Amino acid sequence: MVLTIEALKHLWRLDESRVGRSEPLPLDNRHYVKGHPLCDAFTGLAQIQFGLGCFWGAERLFWQLPGVFSTAAGYAGGGVPYPTYREVCSGETGHAEVVLVVYDHTVISFEQLLQTFWESHDPTQGMRQGNDIGTQYRSVIHCTTSKQYAAASTSREVYQQQLNTAGYTAITTEILHPAPPFYYAENEHQQYLAKHPNGYCGLGGTGVTCPIRLQV
């Protein structure tokens, strides 16, 4: 069964009187690795949100890809505006840890991003990734276009067949369009593993190849 926000609502208690705020958290608007803006209109570039566990390792995974212009760690999919890391980790906001990926589709295809996403985590684990347990670690793809949504949905079906053959259970990845609001994480979480090369990275794939050929 594919998890949706509606199916997840009973797992958390949204209380905007206790958490969240009306203004964004302070942000240094410069990518620590690439030197590009973290927050911008990004005219002429495409955007997508991926959640595949702890955003520290996930963000590094994508900023290393040729054609990716910028990345940012953040929170999305919940009901509380401008949350903090502590609030998200409480499980009361409904948000997932996600990475905003800004890319040049003439250099890297959406297909390549999807392959990286599927092959870099275990999308069958529900509310966890490895030792990281909680609703914030669920697997998500938040699409900014209907074309992305169609491609992501098709890729999930294709990868499910591969996982079935390898003995895995059902994919629990939530795919949404339009993408919910993206809230930037605190400065200390941005490009964390570039600032702390020996820091924690909990990413771990299944070892199953995703053979999609969508050319999106």
Swiss-Prot record:
The keyword Acyltransferase does not apply. Gene3D superfamilies: Peptide methionine sulphoxide reductase MsrA. InterPro entries: Met_Sox_Rdtase_MsrA_dom (IPR002569), Met_Sox_Rdtase_MsrA_sf (IPR036509), MsrA_MetSO_reductase (IPR050162). SUPFAM superfamilies: Peptide methionine sulfoxide reductase (SSF55068). One of its GO terms (cellular component) is cytoplasm. NCBIfam families: msrA. Belongs to the MsrA Met sulfoxide reductase family. This is Peptide methionine sulfoxide reductase MsrA. It comes from Xylella fastidiosa (strain 9a5c).
